[in-house]
Each structure stands twice: as structure tokens, then as C-alpha cells.
Amino acid sequence: MGEVDPAFIQALEHRPKLQTSFAQGIPLIDLSPLINSPEPSQQLVAEIGRACQEWGFFQVINHGVAVKARENIESAARKFFALPKEDKKKVARDEVNPLGYYDTEHTKNVRDWKEVFDFVVRDRSLIPASPDESDDQDQVKELINQWPEFPSDIREVCEEYAAEMQKLADKLLGLIALSLGLERTRFNGFFDDQTTFIRLNHYPPCPAPDLALGVGRHKDAGALTILAQDDVGGLQVKRKTDGEWVLVKPTPDSYIINVGDIIQVWSNDKYESVEHRVKVNSEKERFSIPFFHNPAHYTWVEPLEELVNDQNPAKYKPYNWGKFFSARKRSNFMKLDVENVQIQHFKNHTSLPNTE
């Protein structure tokens, strides 16, 4: 990635400002009470609920994730991305198997300034064979992890890290369920045959950080994202109060938690997924590792019945997660003539009474 190809250049209204402020007041939630007591306090549950409602994301500390597991996967990522391009492309992903290495991903039809390596947490995960709604959703294909020869321990460290992330995700989903007034285990069944995946991100230095983005503006399609970022920083979120893009300052040994679109739908818009993007740096490379927690491909996503009533009717029509996921994956490979599928496409629009 030398000169800036026009494919990377953002439309004028979406270009990042070189000077942006760090966000103030981002919730920083201490999970250490869960270490000593399996039952979370009402205070902790309320903190989680406020963060999901007011920000759509938060940071956690004292989360119980083994420090060594994170250090190992970060080291493996650096070693892998330092390989020659031809070696990385030996495990290149494609439309048939969207796992492995890729360096031409698009977000909202603009190319991202990054390279990635993806693997599923549950090897041989199933997704629909076709993203098209008209095609049979029972026709499925397997997602099979591709592992490079170097670093030699990459599979082992990735699987160890995935197990740590799974434990943290279970804790967080339990807290979010409680904050919505639901049973703590309410979400568990959706993830029995999960399509969760982990991504290793590498953002090389960019000669034109005012024109390109590491990842363009987007919301996460799944249920929950757990992000480990290095000390370089670059993650920006769109603040709900004023619509400004603000930087998330890296906090040592913390994780950033994003509410995804699925939780927005399950909560019937009580919680909202946050729009975010990644700035690039002209001098420093950046690494990050998101864990995208996704349900089984056969899940129909809709507002939960406990949260819907005559006063608060369902704001979304049900949609099939596997089809949604497959369609979003397809858009990563090519520029589309139409906007990529969004949860807004499934909104129930209440018609106004006819006054004529």
C-alpha cells in the first residue's frame, strides 16, 4: 500500500479530520465484582444498562481474560502480517470460503486501508450457501479455518484466545440480559451453533490519513463485539449527543465492547448499536483484534417477546441471521450497485392515519 489509490478515497463528507478530540465520559466498567461473586450486583447491571442505552458501547477492566493469551495472539498477528505478501496469500480468503487473509476489503463501497486475517471460533461453522432471500436457507456451506505455516503456533494461540473471549462474552451477555429485565441466560440458546469469528487487523501507515480510513463508518451487524486495540489508537465513535466523531483513548489491558445490531433489534431499540470507524496514521502501524459474537445461521432475529407489548410494539420484522451475514460478507469483496443490507431495511414503519 504505497500511494493512495482512488479506491481508498472517502467522499468529502466522510473524510476524517486530522485533529479530533478524545471522547470524554466513555463508561469504564470494572468487572472485578464477578470474580468474587457469581451473582452480579444491581449496581453493575445498572451500569451496563446505562452504557448500552446512552453510548452503545463501553470499556471493561478487570475482566478476567488471561493477559498471556492476549499477548500471544498480538505477537502472532505481528509476525503473520510481517510476512511477504505472497506467503500471506497462501491462506487468502475468497467468496467460497470467506476465512483467512484478505487485503482489499470494502466498507460502504470504499476500500479500507488495512489487511485482515479471519477465523471462526467454532471450526466448520455453517452459513447459508447463498445470501439471496429467494434461495433455500437449508442449503448451507461450511466455514473452514485456514491456518498459515508461520508463525507455527498461530492456531494454538488463536484457539486459546477464542476460549478466553467466549468466557467474557458469556459474562457480558448475561449482564446485558439482566439490564433488560430478562433472565440472565436468555440469550444463551441463540449461540449453540454460533457463527462467531475473530479478526486480526493490521493498519499500515497511510500517506494520506485525511483521505482514507482504516475502516469506513459502519455499525456491527452481530450481537456483540469485544475489541482489543493496541496503544496507537484510531477507533472513532459517533457520539449520540451531537453526532461528532470522537477518538476512543486506549486504556491498558481493557476491552472495548460494542452493542451490535442484533442486540438493538432484540431490545426493540432500547439499546442502539454505535456507528464507528477507524482513522489511520501517517507514521505508525496499528493492530487490533475484534471478536464478533454472532448467533447460529438459522436464528431469526426479532424483538424479544418479553420486551414487546401494545404500548411498545415490535419495531422490526424478523430476519434470518445467516442470510444477513452472508450478504454482508459478499459486500466485503466487491462494490455493490445498491446499499448493503442494514437492519433499517427490516423496520416496521407505522403508517400515519389517512386524514383526507
Region spans (language model):
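Peripheral, non-catalytic segments flanking oxidoreductase cores
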Residues: 1-356
